[in-house]
Amino acid sequence: MVLLMEIRFPGGLRVDALHEGFWIRTDQPVAQGGEGTAPSPFDLFLASIGTCAGFYALRFCQQRNLDTRGLALSVTPERDPAGKLVKRIRIRVALPPAFPERYREAILRAVDQCSVKRHLAEAPQFEVVAAAASQEEPSPAEMGLVSTGTPSGVTPESLL
């Protein structure tokens, strides 16, 4: 499976990613020189953990026909006081009022299976390489991996 994201710089401190026909937009907060028009990349990092964990909690309940009204998750990063990096990420699962006690530990084990979280626990190696702008590799669109348009007819180029 080839997973490829195309990254664009639409202006200011905004950085956007095109993935499988979806634009993922980011910006920096105003306090950091951005316009605050979109979440920061770090916000999306935390959101990916929360939404992944949330998916596992939701599916756990759905597979057991449990009421999900009131089910919620929160993600809280705890930073290292000596540095800027996060030392712990706490995922809090708020269970619905009628949630059966016998499933309490099981839903936490399900949330623990979040693939985003698991990738952090067993961190991949990162490889950063430089290439000429003439593209040594074909773009995702050239490889047929992404849609170059949207249902409204807007093309990625018109958004830049």
Locations of the language-model features?
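Extended beta-strand/beta-hairpin segments
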Residues: 1-47, 55-160
